[in-house]
Amino acid sequence: MKKVLIGLVCGVAMSAAAAPKLVLHIDFNTAQFKREVVSDMLHEAARGGYNAILWEIENKVKLDSLPGVPVEEAFTKDEFRGLLKEAEQLGLEPIPLFQTFGHAEYVLSKPAYTNLREQADRYDCYCVSKPEVAELQKKVVAEYLDLFGPKVKWFHLGGDEAHIFATCPVCKARKPMELYSEHLDAVASVLRAKGVRPGIWCDMVMSDKYVADLAKVPRDFIIWHWDYQVGAKNTWTLPWTKQLPKARDLGFDVVFSGSTSSYGDSPYFPEMSLHRANLAYGADLVRRERLAGLCVTSWSVRQNLKQLQRPLVRFAARRLRSPGASAAADWAEVLPTCGVTMSPADFDDFTAWAVVICKYDGRGWRWFKDAVPPPADELDRILAKHGKPDAAVVSNLLAGVRRTLPQAKGVWREAGELQLQLLESCAAIARGERPLPPPHEKVVNHYGREQTPASARNSAAIVLGLAPGKNTKLK
């Protein structure tokens, strides 16, 4: 591209040819992190060459515009401003993220906000036909802008995985993408008035269902394209990935988003081999296609510690900023800097997991991001619906952990021991036996390395929540 400035839309400058941003996502969903842990993430990002933070704060900062929503241990605004000041001193641009369609559990589960739901019995999606939804969200966005300060240039409005979007009678009477775009435009007006560019995730607007109407989305919106599988072997390709050229042809700036932690991981480790390949693919794509940036997401609902994602955080930065001769060589150089004391091949076996056994711990037991432990009989319901875990898959994973665990040290060994215990429980269930009692205090202490006390206890309750009920068929 020869031109740096490709246009003005609604008064917001659109830049395409600048050096790509390298963005680290800090996600407060599910977990309330200690201040020093967030500070450590910021310093890690700055050392690695990241120049922006995507802040997904949800209910972990005490906002005036969302009374009754923040958790008890949430940061005060002054405490959080201290972290923002630290990030600024490290050269990290703030990019706030506020969900405007789905993933609204932390708001809509509260009694004062039930009138904003798309469906009365679901609390994950806003009904954007209701004027009071846009009114509330504009107030929240305005408070975010005040909190994050004048350094904000981009603002992420979420927009992903709104699974029941446009299903109420009023919304259903509208063309979905017209409704979607109108709501985005209304909320984004607060941003445009300050010269801030809005952005959204890709999966709604670039899905097979809606991609024909992608042109209805205003061009000043940055498309945050996410695919946490592409580039890895033996995985699926998400439908919106094949639509990426269309978004570029329509003139959208695009950020590619890979991940260090996503669906399919265990609660103790990210699956290193998958995420490594995905991030290498993403970094190469951003450089080759001159995209607007690479975002390294980290979804806290998956629970594994941020410090155990550090090899992937460093690897992604290296592959974008100063790639070596090969991704494998870069990975081999990164691992020892993160306290890994085994070969890359052994490390892959040590951290391996399988999507098919994710349902046998308590995370995401009803597919809501609401940080609620499962009920007492949930394991029995899962067994009735899905059957027992695949014994061969569990056995293969167990063999890898047992073989490599003696090489691990420090927090890596601690997480490996917990991974081993969880796999042994899965193996017992596969045999039709009751799993061993979980090491509750060890798990609380493990998550307590990074989370506040109440948050660590809740995380342990979620992960360990699938205990057999009174009427279980397990022996």
Where are these regions (language model features)?
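Polybasic, lysine/arginine-rich low-complexity segments
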Residues: K2-K3, K473
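Residue-level recognition of conserved structural "scaffold" positions that shape functional pockets
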Residues: M14, A18, S109, F165-A166, ...
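Feature activates predominantly on carbohydrate-active enzymes
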Residues: C10, A18-G199, F256
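Substrate-binding groove of N-acetylhexosamine-processing glycoside hydrolases
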Residues: V38-H43, G82-K85, G91, P131-F155, ...
